[in-house]
Every structure is written in C-alpha cells, then in structure tokens.
Swiss-Prot record:
It is found in: Cytoplasm. The gene is purA. Its EC number is 6.3.4.4. It comes from the Bacteria. HAMAP family: Adenylosucc_synth (MF_00011). Keywords: Cytoplasm, GTP-binding, Ligase, Magnesium, Metal-binding, Nucleotide-binding, Purine biosynthesis. This is Adenylosuccinate synthetase. Its cofactor is Mg(2+). The keyword Hydrolase does not apply. It is an enzyme of class 6 (ligase). Its main location: cytoplasm. Binds 1 Mg(2+) ion per subunit. Plays an important role in the de novo pathway of purine nucleotide biosynthesis. Catalyzes the first committed step in the biosynthesis of AMP from IMP. The lineage of its organism: Bacteria, Pseudomonadati, Chlorobiota, Chlorobiia, Chlorobiales. It catalyses: IMP + L-aspartate + GTP = N(6)-(1,2-dicarboxyethyl)-AMP + GDP + phosphate + 2 H(+). It comes from Chlorobium luteolum (strain DSM 273 / BCRC 81028 / 2530) (Pelodictyon luteolum).
C-alpha cells in the first residue's frame, strides 16, 4: 500500500510582539498589516492593554478585539490565552458596530478562554491598595486574579456560559470562597450570588454567536492555506516568566505565548515581528534604567502623548535601551523590527542610545531581569546626532533625512535585525516600509 505524503506546516503564521514594556504602537502596525492576513488573533492578556488605531481622522482604542476588525475582509479571533471581561467585550463590540463595521461572523472567541468576574476586579483593587509602597501598578481590571484562578483550576471559562447548571455551580463555589475573603480579610461587603447568576446567564445569550473552538478553527484554516497574524498585548519585558519580575503582567506576551495562547504549533510560524518605540516608556512601577526624570523626559512624554490608553496614567519616558532590546530579540526569535514614533524624536539635537550598563564598576551587556539587579545598573550611552526636521512626508527610507536614516541603521547594526517598518507619524499613511 502506497504511503500518504506528509503535509508540511505552512509557516504562514506571523507573530507580532512588543519588545519593550508595552505601549510600543502595535495597534497601528496590526491595523496596517491586517489586509495582508486572513485572520488576526489576540492570544494573551485582557482589557488591561489598549491598542490605539488612527484612521479617517478618528482615534479608536481597542482592549480585547484584535485591531484587524477594521478591515472587513479580516476575521478576528480572541484566543484561549486571553482573560475576558464580558461587560468590556460587549461594550467594545457595540462600539465597533457603531462605527459601521460588521462583527458577527468576523469575530470568534475561544470556548477555553477564561472569564474575568466582578470579584476578580474587586480583589485586584483590594490587593493593590494593601501593598502600600510595594504596588505593582496594575490596571485594576481583574487580570491577575483571573489568571490566579485559572492556574489554581478554579476559573470559569467561556464554554461554561453555554451550560447554565454548571455555570451556577461554579459561581456558587467561587463566591463562597471569595466572600470569605471580602468578609474576614478585607472586612468588606459580600457579593450577592443570585444577582451574579442572573447577570451571567444573560451573557450566554449575548456571547453565544461568537463562541467556538478556536484552536480547531485556526488549525483548519492554516491547513487550507490561510494566513494568520498573532497579535500580542503588553511587551516582552512584562512577561511573567521573562520580564522584570515581580513588576510584570500575569501572562506571556512573548512569541512562545503566541503558541500556548492560540493553539497554533510553533512550526506554523514563519516570522516574528518585534515592535519597538524609537525611545522607551513604562507604565506603573518597576526598574527602568534609561528613565529620564528631567526636561528631556517631559518633552518625550508631551510630544509622544504618553498617557495609558487603558488607565490614562502618565507613562515614564526614557531613551531606547538596546541591552533590553537585545534580550527581547533573543527570547522571541525576532526576525524583523518595526520602529514606531520616530517622529517624536524630530525636535532633539542629540539622541542617546543605551548600549550597555555599569554594575558594581563593571560594564555589562546582558539584561538582568531580576528587579534588584536591574534597579542598580547605570546606563552607558552612545550619543547620535539628531535631525531637527520632520519625516512625516517620507514614504521611502531614502526620503527620510540622513540623520534619521543613520539612527535606524545604528539600531540595525547593534541588534543584528533589519528594521522593515518605520512609523513617522500617527496616521495610517505616515509609514515607511523597507
């Protein structure tokens, strides 16, 4: 009997990740690239991340729905690695529909994704306030407590909405435990079980059209030759395993997290695009070696409009850190870089780039992820000439001013990865591809 020929993986999936502390401008790139892909997948995080998309004179922030939703030919998937607040998701669906875009039939939600419950959000706020000076700087959206329940095997999943009896049972079990915490530890009010049961039974009807086995769906689509873009939230340096622990998020924004959070095998991935700002920002607490607590940092924040899309919090600003970037390139297997917000540097006569650190009198080029060591390093800078001109009209690399081109070339030489995308302004069209 003749053997059946093997079908090799298509490698038609691309992962797009943040290489820094999040807020790198991934939303613009996903929106721009979505017309080149059949499916866009969000694979981790929750409503704690905001992706801002600018088009047709509008600025839209999405927290859960993938940025590809604004391309009518693109299907969007919320993967099993995401934790979903049903209230936030339904509000977001309504917002997208109000803008005139079709959602039903174009958005699919993994039946294995976990739900963020009201008690998760309350626990998040109570726990953070109890930390005093040791606050992590969470968004208060219930992300951490939801992931805690997931890994403690107590979580409620999207699929549970489809079984009212099971949903009630799980809600009662969870609330019995959580109400003890509210009553005995935090000395607060309990959450009413019956009202929550009624509320979440309604979510079954509203979310049912979107729920499916997305792992099965995605693998079938890949076998049929469809292309997939996997969209990460936050950034590599906030990864729960590879980030600046404990000042991290509760999930895995890395390229490895793309596989576990979507159900797509690694051998389907052909490219890993790393998104980085031309400078650096961080929201919340945690070590930040190149942070600028001076007029330069204020200028970066003001020109770059550096306020969190989710919380509105002011972002901490500093020069780009290539020690951290080299680490991100290695951990994620990045094949190309997308450089965003280059226009924010237009008004600087000199631009500094951190190439190494000083630690206890020694120069180091490796990134320490433990908070204590990272807090002790001092950045060593290389100073480059600024360009003091706008590149907003440039649509080719050659059309950019020489100093801006040299800045990009310097990053490529140091990181040994090509920069294939350069954002020279917030608009969709203000983009240079190479």
């Amino acid at each position: 009997m003749e053997s059946k020929p093997f079908t090799l993986p298509s490698q038609s999936a691309t992962v797009l990740i943040g290489t820094q502390f999040g807020d790198e401008g991934k939303g613009k790139l996903v929106d721009y690239l979505s017309d080149q892909y059949d499916i866009v997948v969000r694979y981790q995080g929750g409503a704690n991340a905001g992706h801002t998309i600018c088009f047709d004179g509008k600025s839209v922030v999405l927290h859960l729905i993938p940025s590809g939703i604004f391309n009518e030919k693109c299907v969007c998937v919320i993967g099993n690695g995401v934790v979903i607040d049903p209230v936030a998701l339904l509000e977001e669906i309504a917002k997208v529909e109000e803008l005139g875009y079709t959602v039903k039939g174009r958005l699919f939600i993994s039946h294995n994704a976990h739900l963020i419950m009201p008690y998760h959000k309350r626990l998040d706020a109570l726990h953070e306030s109890a930390q005093g000076g040791q606050k992590i700087g969470t968004t208060g959206r219930g992300i951490g407590p939801s992931y805690e329940d997931k890994f403690a095997r107590k979580g409620i999943r999207v699929v549970d909405l489809l079984s009212p009896g099971l949903l009630q049972e799980k809600l009662r079990e969870n609330l019995a435990e959580k109400n003890k915490l509210f009553r005995n530890i935090y000395e607060g009010d309990e959450i009413d079980v019956e009202s929550m049961v009624r509320e979440y039974e309604e979510f079954d009807k509203l979310m049912d059209p979107y729920i499916t086995n997305t792992q099965l769906y995605l693998n079938r689509q890949l076998r049929q030759g469809k292309t997939v873009l996997l969209e990460g939230a936050q950034g590599c340096l906030l990864d729960v395993d590879h980030g600046t622990y404990p000042y991290v998020t509760s999930s895995s924004p890395t390229s490895g997290g793309a596989c576990t959070g979507s159900g797509i095998a690694p051998n389907h991935i052909g490219k890993v695009i790393g998104v980085c700002k031309a400078y650096m920002t961080r929201v919340g607490n945690g070590a930040f070696p190149t942070e600028l607590n001076d007029a330069t940092g204020e200028m970066l924040g003001r020109v770059g409009h550096e306020f969190g899309a989710t919380t509105g919090r002011k972002r901490r600003c500093g020069w780009i850190d290539l020690v951290a970037m080299r680490y991100s390139v290695a951990v994620n297997g990045i094949t190309e870089l997308a450089l965003t917000k280059l226009d924010v540097l237009d008004g600087f006569e000199e631009i500094k780039v951190c190439n190494s650190y000083m630690l206890n009198g020694k120069e180091i080029r490796d990134f320490p992820t433990d908070h204590q060591t990272l807090s002790a390093v001092q950045p060593v800078y290389t100073t480059l000439k600024g360009w003091m001109a706008s590149n907003a009209a440039a649509r080719t690399f050659e059309g950019m001013c020489p100093e801006a081109r040299e800045y990009v070339a310097f990053l490529e030489r140091e990181l040994e990865v090509p920069v294939t995308f350069i954002s020279v302004g917030p608009g969709r069209e203000e983009t240079v591809f190479r």
